[in-house]
Amino acid sequence: MAPIDWKKWRHVTKLDPDKKITRQDIAAIVDSGTDAVMISGTQNITKENVGNMIDMLAEYSIPKVLEPSVSAIIRNDVDFIFVPSIFNTKYSKFAVGYHKDFVKNYPDEVLDKVIPEAYIVLNPLSAVAIVTRAQTGISPREAAAYAELADRFFRFPVVYIEYSGTYGNPELVKAVREKLTNTVLYYGGGIDSREKAETMAKYANTIVVGNAVYKKGGIEKLKETIVK
C-alpha cells in the first residue's frame, strides 16, 4: 500500500467521540469526498468512546487521524496521531508539558505516527480555549507571528487555526498563510456552507469541518463544504 500523503488533503471531517452519530452517517461521510476523518474532542473524551468511534470506521479505507486531548486515549490503530501544542497560552503544560509525558510513556511505533500541530486557538467561548486559557484576543499580525515561529523556529509540520465552532476572520487566516514557507496550514471553525469553505480554502491548505455534521441536514451540509 502506498504511503498516505496527508499534506495533500484539502478537506478533513472532524468527529467528536462524545457526540452521537449513526453507522449510516459514518458511511455517508466516508462517501462524501472528504480526504480523511479526524477523531477529536475536548470534553468527556474517554478510551471507550474513542474506541467506539474507531471501531465504526474500521471497515473503511479512508485515512483516520486521532487528535488526542489527553494521552490516555492514544491508540495505535489509526494512520496518524495529530498532537496539538497550544501556542497562544501562557501555560507551558499545553505546549510541551503533557507532550513530554506522552513521549516518555509511548513506544516508537506510536510516536512514529505523530504529526505535531502548532495550535492557535481563537474562540474564547470554546472548550479548548477555556481549558487551555488561550489568549484568544490576538491580532492577525500576532497570529502570523505565532505561525512564523512554528514554521521557522520549531519546524512544526502543521499550523492549525482553531475557531472551534464559530466562523473566523479570513484576513487573519490569510496573514498566517503569507508567513508560512514549509508548514501546512489547517483551518477549523464554523464552516457549514460552500461559500465559507471556498473562502477559507483560498488561504488554508486544509479545511476541517466538524460541527456541521451534527446539525440538521448535517451530511448534506458537509457535502457542500467539500473542496479540492
Swiss-Prot record:
Presence of the UniProt keyword Magnesium in the record: yes
Keywords attached to this entry: Cytoplasm, Lipid biosynthesis, Lipid metabolism, Magnesium, Metal-binding, Phospholipid biosynthesis, Phospholipid metabolism, Transferase
Pathway where this protein functions: Membrane lipid metabolism; glycerophospholipid metabolism
UniProt enzyme class: transferase
Reactions catalysed: sn-glycerol 1-phosphate + (2E,6E,10E)-geranylgeranyl diphosphate = sn-3-O-(geranylgeranyl)glycerol 1-phosphate + diphosphate
One of the GO BP terms on file: glycerophospholipid biosynthetic process
Bilayer-spanning residue ranges: none
Gene Ontology molecular function, alphabetical: magnesium ion binding; phosphoglycerol geranylgeranyltransferase activity
Binding positions (Mg(2+)): 16, 42
UniProt-annotated location(s): Cytoplasm
Cofactor: Mg(2+)
EC assignment: 2.5.1.41
Keyword Chloroplast among UniProt keywords: no
One CC-aspect GO term: cytoplasm
Superkingdom field: Archaea
UniProt cross-references to InterPro entries, sorted A to Z: GGGP/HepGP_synthase_I, GGGP/HepGP_synthase_sf, GGGP_HepGP_synthase, GGGP_synthase_archaea
Sequence positions that bind sn-glycerol 1-phosphate: 14, 160-165, 190, 210-211
Membership in a protein family: Belongs to the GGGP/HepGP synthase family. Group I subfamily.
Xref: NCBIfam families: GGGP-family (TIGR01768), GGGPS_Afulg (TIGR04146), PRK04169.1-3 (NF003199)
Chain's role: Prenyltransferase that catalyzes the transfer of the geranylgeranyl moiety of geranylgeranyl diphosphate (GGPP) to the C3 hydroxyl of sn-glycerol-1-phosphate (G1P). This reaction is the first ether-bond-formation step in the biosynthesis of archaeal membrane lipids.
Protein name stated in the entry: Geranylgeranylglyceryl phosphate synthase
